[in-house]
C-alpha cells in the first residue's frame, strides 16, 4: 500500500509527531532531552524551518512547525531523527539492535486561525494531560517553559508566531480542550488530515492531494442482502 502524500509547503503550519519504536523510551534522562534540543538547534541552522511550539515526552515528541521553503519540514525532521538515532546508538552502545523510531514522522496541515491555537494548546499541555506536572508550564522540555523564560535558554529554538498569541495564554493551555477539539486533533493525527474548518479542509486536501485522509480507513462494510430493504 503506498504511503500517503505529505503536505510540506513553505509558510504553512503543520503538526508533526514521532514515537519511539514500539513506543519505547527515547529520552531516558535529562541529558537525553538536552542532547535532543541541541540537535534541534543544529537542524534549524541547516534547514529552513521554524519551531512554533513543541513538547518532548519520554517516548515521543510533538512539534508545530512552519517551513520557510517548500520541503523544509521534511528535510529538517528527517535530519533530526537520523542524527538523533545515530547519537543515541553511539551513546548507549546499541548500534545494530533495532530502530530508535517507529518510522517516519506523521504530520498534518493546520489552518492559520483559531485552529492553530487549539493544536498549540494540545501540544503544550501534553505532559499535564499525562499527569507528569501540576501545571503545563512546569514541564521543562517544551515551548511553554521556554517562552516563559527570559531570555530563552540556550540553545535558542523558538520563532515568533504568525498570529498574535491569545491573552492569558498560560491559563488557556492549562484548561483542557473540549471533547470536540480533542477528538478532532486526535483524528487529524491518526489520519494525517488537515485541521481547520470544513471549507478550508476540503480545499487543502485537494491542493495537497490529501483527499484519502478525509475518508474512514478500512474496507467498506458489506450490507447483508437479507436486510437490504430494512
Question: Predicted regions span which residues?
Answer:
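Short Pro-Cys-Gly-centered "Cys-loop" motif that presents a nucleophilic cysteine in a tight turn
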Residues: 1-57, 66-230
